[in-house]
Amino acid sequence: TQILMDSANQDGSILVGTGDLSELALGWATYNGDHMSMYGVNASVPKTLVRHLVRYYADTCKDEKLTEVLLDILDTPVSPELLPPKDGKIAQKTEDLVGPYELHDFYLYYMLRAGFEPEKIYRLACETFEGMYDKETIFKWLKTFYWRFFAQQFKRSCLPDGPKVGSVAVSPR
């Protein structure tokens, strides 16, 4: 990150961060690594919205090659790995470690925007995701969400500036 910032300063440009609201809420970033930039363009955009936007553009794009690339991105598991794996498979899949982002984004919205207690969020999640996740899985990832959200606050206390796109954000400003 420091090398990228130095390079940006030499060019008179800025280092734009790609971390999204979901990653910031869970603290799923390396402190002063990918967590730091000069402007966090996706800081208030949840990962599930990013996926929907990419899907929409892939479905409406007239460029077949770009559509193919976008669909490949959507089919690739979320991972912090930066280099191609040696055996051709991604070893570290983020959602295997922290849980499904669609659940975390749901929890985040109802905690921050609606101000609901964990018990109510759990009940709503059980109804909303019935048939997709069992109650034990929903509860497991809800506990993980709350633990990570509060344990990782220190990373959000020093975030770079970024836009507020929707009604939910975790910026300390």
Where are these predicted regions, by residue range?
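ATP/NTP-dependent adenylation/nucleotidyl-transfer catalytic domains that generate, transfer
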Residues: 1-173
